[in-house]
């Protein structure tokens, strides 16, 4: 037997305060553009999809930085350690030698920006040499076409299809006058002829206070359709 308070709460129209589960992230279907919808990967984020399609999610630089591309990262340390200590020592020596050789190759003065420098060290950490950069950030004598060709990235197939879609001519659809509008224009023409000023001040027919220019455009279109020659 429940108490009076419980029975009153059950009859009340106010819902009970239950625990609210976390809303699941809704996957929105891309319907605005058929080309993007056909190439959209729902397992990726919006920024990742835009990058894959060759587009930009934001015109400006993102404030929080960019997502690191881990596909190009080469791990030099093995995931599992070898069983034998001798093999481990040999692998460590090979890794150090590879790191030293890679550092030697990467230090190119023509690839380092002007005003910066890179320090090259040996296996013990001692400074071997300092490489000063000679790469200019902007060369005024450089050809503009070379700069554009260097900065432009290769267009993807999706971008080419979108550009082809955008370059299609737009077919202009002419507005057709309704039957009621034609009847209204016919009444105005029979009453005032080509005097658009009187049409403008006609309070009974021009109830929506259409301007003289608007009335003239409508009547010229109506005359052209009905084959009426202006006086």
Curated annotation (Swiss-Prot):
Q: Name one GO cellular component term.
A: nucleolus
Q: Where is the composition biased (Basic residues)?
A: 1-10, 17-27
Q: Where is the composition biased (Acidic residues)?
A: 85-98
Q: Where are the transmembrane segments?
A: none
Which residue stretches belong to region Disordered? 1-30, 77-108
Q: Which GO terms of type biological process are on file?
A: ribosomal large subunit biogenesis; rRNA processing
Could you list this entry's UniProt keywords, alphabetically sorted: Nucleus, Phosphoprotein, Ribonucleoprotein, Ribosome biogenesis, rRNA processing
Q: What is its main location?
A: nucleus
Q: Where in the cell is it found?
A: Nucleus, Nucleolus
> InterPro entries recorded for this chain?
Ribosome_biogenesis_Nop16
Query: At what positions is Phosphoserine found?
Result: 178
One Pfam family linked to the record? Nop16
Q: Function of this protein?
A: Involved in the biogenesis of the 60S ribosomal subunit.
Which PANTHER family is this protein grouped with? HSPC111 PROTEIN-RELATED, NUCLEOLAR PROTEIN 16
The similarity comment for this entry is: Belongs to the NOP16 family.
Q: How does it assemble?
A: Component of the pre-66S ribosomal particle. Interacts with NOP7, RRP1 and RRP15.
Can you say what this protein is called? Nucleolar protein 16
Q: What species is given as this protein's source? A: Saccharomyces cerevisiae (strain YJM789)
What is the organism lineage in this UniProt record?
Answer: Eukaryota, Fungi, Dikarya, Ascomycota, Saccharomycotina
Q: Gene encoding it? A: NOP16
């Amino acid at each position: 037997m429940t108490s009076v308070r419980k029975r009153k709460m059950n009859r009340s129209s106010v819902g009970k305060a239950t625990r609210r589960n976390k809303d699941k992230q809704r996957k929105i279907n891309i319907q605005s553009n058929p080309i993007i919808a056909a190439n959209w990967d729902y397992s990726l984020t919006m920024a990742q999809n835009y990058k894959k399609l060759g587009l930009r999610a934001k015109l400006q630089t993102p404030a929080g930085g960019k997502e690191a591309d881990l596909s190009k990262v080469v791990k030099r340390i093995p995931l599992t350690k070898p069983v034998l200590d001798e093999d481990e020592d040999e692998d460590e020596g090979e890794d150090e030698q590879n790191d030293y050789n890679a550092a030697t190759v990467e230090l190119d003065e023509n690839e380092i920006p002007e005003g910066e420098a890179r320090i090259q060290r040996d296996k013990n950490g001692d400074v071997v040499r300092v490489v000063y950069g000679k790469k200019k950030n902007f060369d005024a004598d450089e050809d503009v076409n070379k700069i554009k060709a260097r900065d432009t990235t290769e267009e993807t197939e999706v971008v080419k299809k979108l550009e082809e879609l955008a370059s299609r001519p737009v077919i202009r659809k002419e507005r057709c006058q309704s039957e009621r509008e034609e009847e209204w224009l016919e009444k105005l023409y029979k009453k005032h002829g080509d005097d658009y000023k009187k049409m403008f001040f006609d309070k009974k027919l021009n109830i929506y206070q259409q301007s003289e220019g608007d009335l003239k455009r409508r009547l010229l279109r109506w005359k052209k359709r009905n084959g009426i020659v202006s006086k």
